């Protein structure tokens, strides 16, 4: 299982003083050197953490895979077509939220989504959709032309008690299997950390986990290479 590192909160820390450091690009390079298989960043409409210049520099600097999380807007589509990350992950976005709160409502936006994905695919950009681990969302993602789905693991990360944890884990396991059967690659993310990631070693249909906040929070205390190695130790099969 691969680890993709979300560097948004390196930018959050930098923006607290607007003095240019810590640099998200420097962090991305260090993450790659420490074993990350990809770098994730979310260019929000309000630019609350990652800025346009960060994205441009990341595109030039990293050697693995750049995953651009973004809303389904014409502005973001234009940016993605210009920058051409290896992967775009479409996420729902609300200005008032602290972080992405749930999966993309594909059934509500299916026609627009299909039209949005096509030019990205035509220009060599793979497309993932951040969804709840539900059968209908997976089927619609495949029909819309996505290459991948990222399963929302927030409910799992917030689950308490063995019964609820097992229930949420089984939802993810089943969704991952259905997605693979539909021809989609599978990523999982949101709220994952060294404290809850170990069971994912047994979810063989999931190829990659995307982790940001917990990893960066740990890195503040022990350093980014150590924080990444701790996670890699927990997900190695």
UniProtKB/Swiss-Prot annotation:
3-amino-2-oxopropyl phosphate binds at residues 6, 17, 191, 212-213. It is found in: Cytoplasm. Its EC number is 2.6.99.2. SUPFAM superfamilies: Pyridoxine 5'-phosphate synthase. It comes from the Bacteria. GO terms for molecular function: pyridoxine 5'-phosphate synthase activity. InterPro entries: Aldolase_TIM (IPR013785), PyrdxlP_synth_PdxJ (IPR004569), Pyridoxine-5'_phos_synth (IPR036130). GO terms for biological process: pyridoxine biosynthetic process. It catalyses: 3-amino-2-oxopropyl phosphate + 1-deoxy-D-xylulose 5-phosphate = pyridoxine 5'-phosphate + phosphate + 2 H2O + H(+). 1-deoxy-D-xylulose 5-phosphate binds at residues 8-9, 44, 49, 99. GO terms for cellular component: cytosol. Pathway: Cofactor biosynthesis; pyridoxine 5'-phosphate biosynthesis; pyridoxine 5'-phosphate from D-erythrose 4-phosphate: step 5/5. Transmembrane segments: none annotated. Its main location: cytoplasm. The active site is at residues 42, 69, 190. Keywords: Cytoplasm, Pyridoxine biosynthesis, Transferase. Catalyzes the complicated ring closure reaction between the two acyclic compounds 1-deoxy-D-xylulose-5-phosphate (DXP) and 3-amino-2-oxopropyl phosphate (1-amino-acetone-3-phosphate or AAP) to form pyridoxine 5'-phosphate (PNP) and inorganic phosphate. Homooctamer; tetramer of dimers. Belongs to the PNP synthase family. This is Pyridoxine 5'-phosphate synthase.
